[in-house]
Amino acid sequence: ALHEAFPPDGAPAAGPAQALLQRIAQIPRVSYCGNPLVNSVLSLKSRRAQELGIHMEIQVGHTDTGQLHNLELCSLLGNLLDNAIEACVPLTPTGEPVILVNLHSQGHLLVLAVENPVATLPKSSATGEYFTTKANPERHGLGLQSARRIAQQHDGCLLTELKGSCFRATAMLSTEIRSGS
């Protein structure tokens, strides 16, 4: 699948695409499922977490992605995992925080749940949506918005909850083929 990103003459893709492909090519191959791009994202994020002193437990069951484009799935995974990793970094001096990742199909739904401890409780709006506490909020806090948008585009939703000092984001997306698609 990744070799398809290279032009037919065998020359590597130019620019940012080339840099991304080179980075992905260096990732140790771990097979979580039958989708090589999902495997690459999970491997990349797991490796990054490990480098930061964070343990990631990944469970992937049968995954039927149906109409979901690989780019959307990788964006969803990447955004939720980046948020979880970032939330765990302040906890590493006192131990090894654990991020739990579960990706599976349930009927005609693809379910992705990411759970992580937090050092600072995130702020939420009156509607229960969480938002960034970083400086320059116009340039940050887009990960959950993006994940929510992807879920909604696929007749699904993104649920977020905070229990004690544990944050959980669960994306549910329909994998049914829409009529007219």
Regions found by a protein language model. Give the residues of each.
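Short alpha-helical Gxxx[C/S/T] motif in the catalytic ATP-binding
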Residues: G143-A147
